[in-house]
Amino acid sequence: MLMKRATLTNQVGLHARPATFFIQRANEFKSSIWVERDDRKVNAKSLLGVLSLGVVKGGEITLIADGDDEEEAIAALVHLVETNFGESES
């Protein structure tokens, strides 16, 4: 099991569009993946679960993965968060 924290810096946090990119990326991996915020943990492959966390700009999440490709999964999802889900910061 692998865990890593990440802080959302995109303008609107984890709303519908970034959450969709996030779960699409998470679903590329075989590992079980969760997102945790404020002691609440949801399946990272579930759009409703991820949206229900209500993560806003500056919010910190913990990514947790368990499985054969856990390292790759965490690295890919952290990269997605750190690059603002491909959104411009205008």
Describe the residue ranges of each PLM region.
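Short amphipathic
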Residues: 1-10
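Generic anion/oxyanion-binding catalytic loop in active/binding sites
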Residues: 8, 39, 62, 66
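Compact, glycine-rich, soluble single-domain proteins
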Residues: 9-48, 52-57
